[in-house]
């Protein structure tokens, strides 16, 4: 079986004038034969926020190999911004994210010169008024398993403050769910994640590693805060209808029952972007058809 071939590519643009289009999302749904691209544009017209969608020409056949998700904390709008700015920046919190199984997903968040250099820390992941396009992965019968990679583990007493706090936050969230075991820290995963983080250029563009692991990315959060932001997507998850949703992929990877190990890396970018965090998971989560068995309800 193959991984469900789904990638979502989002770019969010914030300018001082907030001229239309304010937010653009592009969703690629890769089936066995081809990739269909749907572009959604969120814009403000006569004081009203509107969304339009357009199906673009199919792209070439995709062969993604890994699971990857990302989350960006957007810059805060200046105090003089109009109410339309608030609407658009609220949309950015959820739309500037990437979820999927991909080797080449990219998220770009561009801040204008008039944008504040501080970052908004997300406290909720509820869906904004500006809608985004959601695709459901093509059905598969893939059995969850990671690539054949041995992961050396560390005892909690050997961990750095960053590793200890991120692992503890993951396990705190997992403990809230029925029959969901704690994760152990993997030095192999952490080394992979840190190597990738060290090469990040702090540009505000998030590009997934395309490696063999599950992957969550965040920009503008420290380690524990990134885990909190990912987990807060639980508010959008429908336990009565388990499955894929573009705005719950971070949450489902954090609590994925079959995942046993995690390792994370961090790079301090400073300025507008703050910290860049990447967490790798083994075995990877978010397999189509396995949500009911791996995303348990609250205890």
Curated annotation (Swiss-Prot):
GO biological process assignments: fatty acid transport; sexual reproduction; sterol transport
Gene Ontology annotations for the cellular component aspect, listed alphabetically: endoplasmic reticulum; extracellular region; extracellular space; fungal-type vacuole; nuclear envelope
Signal peptide interval: 1-19
SUPFAM superfamilies: PR-1-like
UniProtKB keywords: Glycoprotein, Lipid transport, Lipid-binding, Secreted, Signal, Transport
GO molecular function: cholesterol binding; fatty acid binding; magnesium ion binding; sterol binding
Subcellular location: Secreted
Gene3D superfamilies, per the entry: CAP
Processing after translation: O-glycosylated.
UniProt main location, coarse: secreted
Region (Disordered) location: 103-157
Pfam families referenced in this protein's UniProt entry, alphabetically: CAP (PF00188)
Annotated SCP domain residues: 167-281
SMART domains: SCP
PANTHER family: CYSTEINE-RICH SECRETORY PROTEIN-RELATED
Comment text on domains: The SCP domain is necessary and sufficient for lipid export and sterol-binding.
Family note: Belongs to the CRISP family.
Other comments on record: Present with 556 molecules/cell in log phase SD medium.
Role: Secreted protein required for efficient export of lipids such as acetylated sterols. Acts in detoxification of hydrophobic compounds.
Annotated protein name in UniProt: Protein PRY1
Species this protein is from: Saccharomyces cerevisiae (strain ATCC 204508 / S288c)
Organism lineage string: Eukaryota, Fungi, Dikarya, Ascomycota, Saccharomycotina
């Amino acid at each position: 079986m193959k991984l469900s071939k789904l990638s979502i590519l989002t770019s969010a643009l914030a300018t001082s004038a907030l001229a239309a289009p304010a937010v653009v999302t592009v969703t690629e749904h890769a089936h066995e034969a081809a990739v269909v691209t749907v572009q959604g544009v969120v814009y403000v017209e006569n004081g009203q926020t509107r969304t339009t969608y357009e199906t673009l020409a199919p792209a070439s056949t995709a062969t993604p190999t890994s699971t990857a998700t990302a989350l960006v904390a957007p810059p805060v709008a200046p105090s003089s911004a109009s109410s339309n700015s608030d609407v658009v920046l609220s949309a950015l919190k959820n739309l500037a994210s990437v979820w999927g199984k991909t080797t080449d997903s990219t998220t770009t968040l561009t801040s204008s010169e008039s944008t504040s250099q501080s970052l908004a820390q997300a406290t909720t992941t509820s869906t904004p008024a500006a809608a985004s396009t959601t695709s459901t992965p093509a059905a598969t019968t893939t059995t969850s398993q990671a690539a054949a990679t041995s992961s050396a583990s560390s005892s909690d007493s050997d961990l750095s403050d960053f590793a200890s706090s991120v692992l503890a936050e993951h396990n705190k969230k997992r403990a809230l769910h029925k029959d969901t075991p704690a994760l152990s820290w993997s030095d192999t995963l952490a080394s992979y994640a840190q190597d990738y983080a060290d090469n990040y250029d702090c540009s505000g563009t998030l590009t997934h590693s395309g490696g063999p692991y599950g992957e969550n990315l965040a920009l503008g959060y420290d380690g524990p805060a990134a885990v909190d932001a990912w987990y807060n997507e639980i508010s959008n998850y429908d336990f009565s209808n388990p499955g894929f949703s573009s705005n719950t992929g971070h949450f489902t990877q954090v609590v994925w029952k079959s995942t046993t190990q995690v390792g994370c890396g961090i790079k301090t970018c400073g300025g507008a972007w703050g910290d860049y965090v990447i967490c790798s998971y083994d075995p990877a989560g978010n397999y189509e058809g396995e949500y009911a068995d791996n995303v348990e309800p609250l205890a």
